[in-house]
Amino acid sequence: MLVRPCKLYAEQVMSYKEEMSQNGDSFDGCAGLEDVYSFDEWIDFEGRLRKKYKTGYVPSEVFLAVRQSDKFLVGMIDFRHPLSDFLKNYGGNIGYSIRPSERQKGYASEMLKLVLPICRDFGESKVLLTCDKGNVASQRTIIKNGGMLENEI
């Protein structure tokens, strides 16, 4: 399930950050989590991202992907709207990541499936996702959710 960031998940968010850092992963969809030292600092920044944070930025809606059975944080996803010129080429509307210990379990596909109706609620009938050419797992996730290759840069 997707939930908005809140204090209830503070320890798990910081644990997520630690696991991603130790694995050397990029923090796609994490709303600057890699650049903060505390949950409070991150939640403040995430709140500012929901508005037009600064010139060149667009509003961003951030969600935590929480496994229903045990309320464990498995991933993060953000939805940026509307597309800026930069996002049209790099990043797209949606960014996401799955914590290393929870990969290959279908969570990325489920997160994307759950966020698409939210995108429509914000007036985006068509969304752009980007991924590196060599990221086969992300390509499969996008295709599984109805995406198609538009172009390569």
Q: Model-found features: residue ranges?
A:
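Conserved catalytic-core motifs of GNAT/GCN5-like acyltransferases
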Residues: 130-131, 143-153
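Conserved GNAT acetyl-CoA-binding A-motif
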Residues: 119-130
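GNAT-family acyltransferases
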Residues: 1-93, 118
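Short coil/turn motifs at secondary-structure junctions
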Residues: 82-84, 101, 134
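Conserved beta-strand-loop-alpha-helix junction that forms the acyl-donor binding cleft
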Residues: 129-139
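Polytopic alpha-helical membrane proteins, predominantly small-molecule transporters/carriers
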Residues: 62-66, 99-102, 131
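Conserved acetyl-CoA-binding loop-helix of GNAT-fold acetyltransferases
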Residues: 95-98, 104-117, 121, 139-144
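Short aromatic/hydrophobic contact patches that present stacked aromatics
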Residues: 1, 95, 128-130
